[in-house]
């Protein structure tokens, strides 16, 4: 879990877009390996995609 102070700091809008924090939008708040399109970290993305809870996403098979 992310610290409460970091979550509050993340809500402030930065002067430049690249200075913003990317944290997992799910409950974990992980700061690394965040997919911006889905606002999820790779771990949460994998769990939700395997359960079929993200529309249009499925596991690749070839």
UniProtKB/Swiss-Prot annotation:
Coiled coil: none annotated. Pfam families: Ribosomal_S14. Binds 1 zinc ion per subunit. Its cofactor is Zn(2+). Disulfide bonds: none annotated. One of its GO terms (biological process) is translation. Zn(2+) binds at residues 24, 28, 41, 44. The keyword RNA-binding applies. GO terms for molecular function: metal ion binding; rRNA binding; structural constituent of ribosome. InterPro entries: Ribosomal_uS14, Ribosomal_uS14_bact, Ribosomal_uS14_sf. One of its GO terms (cellular component) is ribonucleoprotein complex. Transmembrane segments: none annotated. Keywords: Metal-binding, Ribonucleoprotein, Ribosomal protein, RNA-binding, rRNA-binding, Zinc. Binds 16S rRNA, required for the assembly of 30S particles and may also be responsible for determining the conformation of the 16S rRNA at the A site. Part of the 30S ribosomal subunit. Contacts proteins S3 and S10. Belongs to the universal ribosomal protein uS14 family. Zinc-binding uS14 subfamily. This is Small ribosomal subunit protein uS14. It comes from Spiroplasma kunkelii. The lineage of its organism: Bacteria, Bacillati, Mycoplasmatota, Mollicutes, Entomoplasmatales.
């Amino acid at each position: 879990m992310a610290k409460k102070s970091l979550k509050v700091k993340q809500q402030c809008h930065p002067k430049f877009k690249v200075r913003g924090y990317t944290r997992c939008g799910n409950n974990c708040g992980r700061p690394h390996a965040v997919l911006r399109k889905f606002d999820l970290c790779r771990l949460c993305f994998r769990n939700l995609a395997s359960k079929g809870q993200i529309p249009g996403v499925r596991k690749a098979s070839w």
